[in-house]
Amino acid sequence: MKKIIDFMEENVDGRTLFTKELVYELENGALQGVYSDQISFSNLKYSQSGFQIDMFIVSNEKIWLIDKEGQRDKLRKDFSSVSMFRFELAMRKSTNAITGCFRFISASGKNVPAEAVVSGIYDVRLENSVLKLSESQVLYRDQPIQDGRYKPVAFQAEHRFYCEDGKLHYEYDGRCFDVDAKTMQRRHSSDTFPPFISIEK
């Protein structure tokens, strides 16, 4: 774990990164999302058994209804906000593995989709100077669909931290699942998202 904490202290804590605008489709093209952000990592704290670090995100995210001609019609939802999340990780003596959680702390704005959402973090490893970890969201969160409605979804993702030319890179590659809110069963969603790649300037 010391190598991972050293990596976080040297390469991640105190860094600010930017995600260029990217576009994704929802509901088989009925909606279109446009996203960009600024991410800052700070407040790294650690003990003999674990560590935590905060992630501040200033995001600009809008979801549009798409008309029959494939053009943006009406703004369905504006998720733009300033949010704070926290990674909390610890070493497990039973397996010598690092596990923990990634959770929402606070945000500006109303009806924040990540509010009260927690993800489990596992498979944390440092390979060839790349810090990798896997995320699996607990339960479900809301995702806007047509006609002013929402559907329950959950995400699984891979996170990667690495440096190129002295600049920190952070990659988030997520997969969306539709969730049966009664049974909590998941099935692959038709909604797909490109990898989010944030780079320090």
Question: PLM features: what roles do these ranges have?
Answer:
Residues 8-10, 23-25, 42-46, 56, ...:
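Short, exposed beta-strand/loop patches in secreted or surface proteins that constitute
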Residues 11, 18, 49, 81-83, ...:
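Residues that act as N-cap/strand-start positions at coil-to-secondary-structure junctions
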Residues 13-16, 92, 96, 180, ...:
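Low-complexity intrinsically disordered segments
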Residues 40-43, 115-129, 137, 148-159, ...:
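Edge beta-strand at a domain terminus
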Residues 61-70, 76, 106-116, 140-149, ...:
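Flexible, membrane-facing loop/turn or short amphipathic-helix motifs
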